[in-house]
Design a protein with these regions (language model features):
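Membrane-embedded translocation segments of transport machinery
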Residues: 2-7, 11, 169, 173-321, ...
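Extracellular loop-to-transmembrane helix junctions
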Residues: 38-64, 144, 390-394
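Membrane-interface "cap" regions at the ends of multi-pass membrane proteins
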Residues: 1-32, 61-66, 70-83, 87-94, ...
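A generic transmembrane alpha-helix motif of multi-pass inner-membrane proteins
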Residues: 379-400, 421-457
């Protein structure tokens, strides 16, 4: 193991880890998914529940996964395997490793959609995006959706080929500051539109009347995306972290950064929707279509909407790229560690998997629309399988590994290697042993029961 540790790639320091891990978190999950869920499930009350959960459940899982990666210098399969070869441990490692392999193909399809929208705004055809039927016609076109998906995929793989420092870290150091600046600019523009203050109030001020059990379940599910929990990413990135870098300080920074960007995304989109529709309930309930159908209509109704459209979809593209890089890196690392493959060979295999599975999702609304998985289109199925089933199971596996196999004390020792005290140790200990596995089980049971029609969510 010592030889492997010496040869393993590493981030240059805290900044490299923070920006790369934040890049993994600040993706479509925050820019695309968080705002439409906040709009749909109560605005301010959803935000409050999310922040409380992120500061407890989310924080605990980030620390646990990062520490696990650093103490073993392994990606998920090797990290679990370092503590035994029993079937349960192998299962826990592989489910954490397989998740990013299944997510990044359909994630890249959505990234391709973003490329299409950005290119339309840049070419001066942004007004076409606001027309009824544009989005459905595009995703059902087959060839256009496939080409955009392939462009996004090739760009991601090119960065992965370059390695951890020259690829992942370098791109994150450039894209993340730009993403922050664009977020502030667009949010500032959005909240100053006529009627937008009602949207700000809806998003930031909790209203208990909007609270429901679904608010909690949805906020818990969103955390997996917003903080990159249970995807194998944080274990992998933790394995690249140097021993003199503070885990607690680094993970707190990632947590705060990701949450701040999620809030900024809400301020970009929800006030703009209120300005456009006056807070029409149907518009707020638009769900996943909010960014690709409603937002172009909002921009079309604005002065300088063309410029805002370019900036907005450029921001979304940056966010999508940083997350797809992290997902792909986690997958590539698994093959490097477990099969002893070169980075080039592992990246080539992941590229083939991305093209094969991603093409199913890209063509799933067009030529393959008649083929479904359990009544769902391919993209919807892969999203349900990973987010609602596999991630909760992976989170439970992490909790059991830390609390029942490794021992919480070992994780505490890893966290304090930099010589600083573990300030939130009591919260971590209680959450990892009791509440985190319970929360993950609630998400799993609720999601599966809803899919089977036993409950309505």
């Amino acid at each position: 193991m010592d030889t492997q540790k010496q040869k393993r790639s590493a981030f240059s320091g805290k900044i490299g880890f923070v920006l790369s891990a934040a890049g993994a978190s600040v993706g479509l999950g925050n820019i695309w998914r968080f705002p439409y869920l906040a709009a749909k499930y109560g605005g301010g009350i959803f935000l409050l529940v999310y922040i409380v959960l992120a500061a407890t459940f989310g924080y605990t899982m980030i620390v646990a996964e990062t520490a696990l990666g650093r103490m073993t210098h392994k990606s998920p399969v090797g990290a679990f395997g370092a503590f035994g070869k029993k079937g349960g441990l192998r299962f826990g490692g592989w489910i954490n490793a397989v998740i990013p392999i299944l997510i990044v193909p359909y994630y890249s399809v959505i990234g391709g959609w973003v490329i299409r929208y950005l290119s339309e705004y840049i070419s001066g055809h942004g007004s076409e995006l606001s027309q009824d039927g544009y989005f459905s016609n595009f995703i059902s076109s087959g060839l256009s959706a496939e080409v955009c998906f392939l462009i996004f995929t090739v760009f991601t793989l090119a960065i992965i080929f370059a390695g951890v420092r020259n690829g992942v870290e370098r791109v994150s150091k450039v894209m993340m500051p730009v993403l922050v600046v664009l977020s502030v600019v667009i949010a500032g523009y959005s909240v100053t539109r006529p009627g937008a203050l009602e949207g700000v109030k809806y998003f930031l001020v909790p209203n208990v009347a909007n609270f429901s059990w679904m608010t909690v379940v949805t906020a818990m599910g969103q955390m997996f995306y917003s903080l990159s929990i249970a995807m194998g990413i944080l274990v992998t990135f933790g394995s690249y972290m140097k021993k003199d870098v503070s885990i607690e300080e680094s993970t707190e920074t990632v947590e705060l950064f990701a949450t701040a960007i999620a809030i900024m995304a809400g301020l970009m989109i929800i006030p703009a929707v209120f300005s456009f529709s006056g807070g029409d309930p149907d518009t707020l309930q638009a769900g996943p279509a909010l960014m690709f159908i409603t937002i172009p209509k909002v921009f079309e109704s604005m002065g300088f909407g063309h410029v805002v459209g370019i900036l907005f979809f450029l921001l979304v593209l940056f966010a999508a790229v940083t997350s797809s890089i992290a997902l792909t890196e986690s997958a590539v690392s698994t093959f490097e560690d477990e099969l002893g493959w070169s980075r080039e060979r592992a990246t080539a295999l992941i590229g083939l998997i991305m093209v094969a599975l991603g093409s199913l999702s890209a063509l799933g609304y067009g030529p393959l629309a008649g083929v479904t998985m359990f009544g769902m289109q391919f993209l919807d199925f892969f999203d349900f399988l990973t987010n609602s089933v596999m991630m909760p199971i992976a989170a439970i596996a992490i909790c059991l590994l830390v609390s029942r196999v490794i021992g919480v004390q070992k994780i505490e020792e890893e966290v304090t290697l930099d010589g600083k005290p573990f300030r939130r140790k009591k919260i971590f200990n209680f959450m990892i042993q009791y509440l985190c596995p319970i929360f993950a089980a609630i998400i799993l049971i609720s999601s599966v029961a809803n899919a089977l029609g036993w409950i309505a969510m």
